[in-house]
Amino acid sequence: AEYEIDGGMVNLRADKLVGTQIFFDKNTVGATINAIMASVKADGLTIIENAAKEPHVVDLANCLNSMGADILGAGTDVIKIRGVKYLHGTTYSVIPDQIEAGTFMAIAAAARSNILIRNVIPKHLEPITQKLVKIGVQVEQFDDAVRVIGGPEYFGTSIKTNPHPGFPTDMQPQMAAVLTCAKGASMVTESIFDNRFRYVDELRRMGANISVEGRVAVIEGVERLKGAPVKATDLRAGAALIVAALGAEGVTEIYDIHHVERGYENMEVKLRSLGADIQKVDEPDPTAEEKLLRKAL
């Protein structure tokens, strides 16, 4: 394929694609998924080495195979794809979103509540479950559900994000929000993404005691967070602020929630069904003073 980068956009052109050997220097979900989709109708054999092993990578391969693709090894370090000429329609049930489930697990912990989360695959949640149990949260596992029961107090721990089956980077901000009120110190190490601590300044507005040095955040637990106006800087940062707000004292206003809506369907509706006092409001056009305040956020 030929490609060019123009104004932040990547333009690709090819009369046809040909199978090849791909080695990823860094384990990456997005690149693995794109390589799989590009290879299913390419001529010949494509071998992807150091492939991501996340459950949704396996699920994509299973879905494509049900459409006539020839994919072997999804969920291992090496995926082999022999291109086919045609794909056909299928009926397929997508696996539950383990990050959405994990976020509600974090909410139960932060709010010291009791939540039963249905339609999940508990095995996919094990890294999250283990950390929650370690800090003092009670988690009960069923065939396709988990019950999370928050405790009266939590204790600090260390978390390091890693590719699957390690602790997922997409749960790092939400777990950090829980740890802001855990006794003692916690250390959160982000080994996958840069700039994954952009939510820290917003949690500080709520009273969190967090210091960041490079890829490591040190959290000194406080008794309780306090509501404040904060801004969602990205999808998981916004989720972390919701986690924090539901355990905080007073009212929290979260701006730029379009980031959250990109990855969570009807979140405020689900939270209200659990008894949360939360509502989505349309913002009027800001005054000049409000614009300055927003800029300061």
Locations of the language-model features?
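Structural preference for solvent-exposed beta-strand-turn elements
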Residues: 1-297
